[in-house]
UniProtKB/Swiss-Prot annotation:
Entry GO terms, CC: cytoplasm; nuclear matrix; nuclear pore
GO MF annotations in UniProt: small GTPase binding; tRNA binding
Record-given protein name: Exportin-T
UniProt KW keywords: Cytoplasm, Nucleus, RNA-binding, Transport, tRNA processing, tRNA-binding
Gene: LOS1
Amino acid sequence: MEEQLIQAVEIASNPLANAGPDVTSQALQFLEHLKTITHESWSVGWSVWSARNPQDNGPKYSQNARMFGLMLVDDFLANRISLSTDPAAAVATLQQSAVEYIQNEYVAGSGDASVAYIKNKFAQVLAVLLLQTYNLPPPYTLLPTLLSMIRAHPAASPSQQSTLQLPINPLTTDLVLRVLHDLSVTLGSDVTLRAVRSKERLQRDAVIRDEIRANHASNIADSVWRIVEEGFNRVNQGEHASNPNSASGVRSMNFTNAVDLTAAATKIVEDYVSWIDINLVVTNQTVPLLFNVLHHPIPKIRTAAADALHGIVSKGMKPADKLSLAQALNLPQVITPLESRTRTGPSAQNGQSDTSDSNIEFREHLAHLTNGLVLEMCKILEESAAEESTRAAAEDLLNSLLPLVLAFLSDEYDDASEQTFSGVNMILSIYKKARRRGAELTGARAEFLSNLIGVALQKMRFDDEAEWPAGSFGAAEDDDDDDDEEDAKFLEMRRSLQTIVGAIAAIDDKLFSTSVAQLVLSTFASFETSSSDSDGQISWQQIELALYVIHFYGDVMTTATAAPKVGLSPAMFVQSPEAGSKGRAPKLGNEALAGLPLSNLGEMVQKLVQSNVSSFPHPAVQLQFFECLVRYSNFFAARSGCVLDALPAFLDWRGVHHEKLGVCKRVNYLLYRFVRDLRAVAAVPMDYVERLLQGLQDLLVVRAELPQVDADEDPLIKATAPAGYFDSQLYLFETSGILVSLLNNAPNDQVVLLKAISEPLSEQMRQAVQAFQRNPTDLTSVLQVHHLMLALSSLSKGFPDLSPTSTQPEPQWVGVFKSITEQVLVSIGAMNSFSVVREAARGAFARMVSTCGKAVLPYIPGLIDALLSEVTSAELVDFVNFLSLVVNKYKDDVRSIVDQLLLILVERIFFFLNQGVTGTDDAVEKSELQKAYMNLLSSMVQSGMESVFVSDKNVGQLETVLQSVVFYSTNSDAACQRTAFSILHRLVASWAGSSAVNGSTEATLPGFERFIYEHLVPLIFEAPAKDTFDFKDAQSQIVLTEISTLAKTIFQKRGDEMIQFLLEVYLPGINCPPQLAQDFTTNLTTLDSKAFKKYLDAFITRSRGG
């Protein structure tokens, strides 16, 4: 099998060199088979891995073959050892063979040619083997044997002389350190791995950790610290120091592997300190050594030392013990000079800024170490069981760390800053709890907060050399790629910093408010100075930061002052009067608000509007300016005069006429939001409306352009798929509609302005239809009609919806939209073969109905006539849902329309429902159409339109409709079943009349009594008796409620006649025992609906054998 394995690996590794694909396939199948039987194939795998070449005593086989063999051993030890016939013997054999291999390859050989991936895999297998040796009887010898090999050499074995007299063998030491690292990770120093392991695995690991702690931890710690010490000494000798053992057959470290081994051994300290005795790690000898390593300029070893110290300070300990450890280490005194010496940028020592990757990385590790100690001190402060003196000393130590926290948070590079976030948030949490207890922030805490908010706000600023990520602010060009990862990271950091600033505001809202106001107002002052001084300069980054801070100020303050439900109301912008006797400030009108002094936020927004900062020539500034106006649109309820300062910027080169298309797209939306919100607070100056519309006039032009397409692409679909400029242009039409709608007090002017916008568009639509009729291949005209329909419907969307119950005279502007609706009908009649036009027409019509109400209802039949012959199943769903909404809203007003349409509509619905299902998409569409159909029938019944079903036009289809409802009551999802049963019990209530026994003279719909007994009564029992009906499901319980309501409704309408039918016909027919049948009818007649539902549940469960 060994030769077969070698051949298979070589074939699989080089498929082009063999005879053909069949041979490769056979080789791969053979190798896969070996991987499934590693409890048998592991021995072959080990043989291939460890086989030696007799000529040079090196590995016999290729690296690929050896690695595959080792993978078989790894899988056996990790996953399949329990399948072995003798697991203990297999482990013992592997242990002995592994030691022999190390002697041959690492003590006497080349150490697997120092190939890192081979050494890593072998170390991983050794770690798993070491774990399995703990299932053998003690003593456990593999770990001590491995540690003894650290000083094993070709010419002097450990048995020949004291190993302490020998130097470290770099090859064996490297391997042993890799094994120790994998062993610690496997045993649980990696918290992530522990979180996903089984309880049994965790228990096994705990037993092995206890064994190592009791018998091997001291040896591990001593060996590792000696490696650190000897490796570091060799590093200090320099790169060109001579090797004293070069001729003795004893291997010694050179400079390169001394650096590697020192770093690796230091890393082991971090691995093991979390689960071995701290006294083995922290001693009078080891701490100075670790500090020396930390101060060494070589990046690899000093970052390892920083991580080791982080592991030490993060070790789980009692508060008093942790404090003693932290005080003994005195890390603030150690880290402070290192932080100062490694600074970059303007704050670098002596102007010497080291921006190398290694220095930046080291600062990140120092920040991580500082943050770790901060978290530990915070935990002591949070520990209620800790002595007061312990907490006081912990706060003193924490205070000594705060300058370091601020230094790293303000680092020029974000990675170091981000390391401090968790510690800063925990500090702020402690401060916040103290404030809740009534404690004042004084001394170090107050000073830290004051410094922290300044640092956090400045850290939010874009770098001087940064490019503005337009896409992240909704201003990407149509052909822009996504913003890169660095931009995303910065924006994520901004959000984290905003969380920190928000926490500060919750502790001291005055500090927050003052700090933000100072930043904002000083920036605006600098901008004004630079605008008037030709030599003055201010960067877009500075202004954008001020605007960004204004933008989030309101949200932070509403949360900090515990008033999120109030939100950014107009009262937020003024100094409101005191609350009344009920504890609430009075609600003020715009005139009252105008007479109150502005709040801090109001002052900033007013300064923003009046500063002309939007004229700064950078899109980031302009767009953030508009974002702020929209965020704080309620400000203009308090200072309506400022609207005239804000609106011009929207209309000129700074806004909707910006040179960058991406900015225009975003501003189109923001202008819509701004005008809509101003309407809500009655802050739009009426005499300014016409000027605004004139400013938008040149943009209210629709120009459809077909995109370039491949041979298999539909140009119309491609043109309407992406959210390009036209989609944002629709907001301008809606904005125009809002503006025109405000002129209700001048209806003639209102109609004139509305026609000025709409009539050119309607005329373009008419011309496009004519162009298409002359040339049916003219797809540009089709797309133009699509765009114009959407533009006109967006225009109508700006008007408030007319109430269906309104008794006011019809506004004059309704007539304009009726004309538009007529033009839409003409256009869809000519272009109904194009799905994009059908979709636009449906959308436009739905919008017109909402806006104009009853006035456009008579046009619905014309729309259906134009659509039905071409409509798809998905489109039909949309239209049926629309019709359901119309029925619910207008009820009797659309009775005649529904009567006229129902027959052809139901026929079209059945056409699609009767189609076969060929895939998942078809199944989903069919399900959606079922729901839409049921909802339409339900809307008709709930709106009192039962008579439509039995009108002269539709009565011939009644039986088919009823049968379809019965069908879907048991052959659809729960939501559809619920609707179906709801329809049925409402129809029973309307059409079932009453039996003479009940003393009523209500007439029964001819034939409906038969339908009840032939279909509905059996349905009460058959539907919940189905295997697919899950009584434990909440939706099914709702269906059962409707079923029980149907039963009770039939009884209420037919009385004893129903009881007689159940006892004499139906229940005997399904072999129901007489006593149980009598019990059912008794409960049906005596229980209310809620109680009967519970009984029906139990009855069906019992009948199903449950």
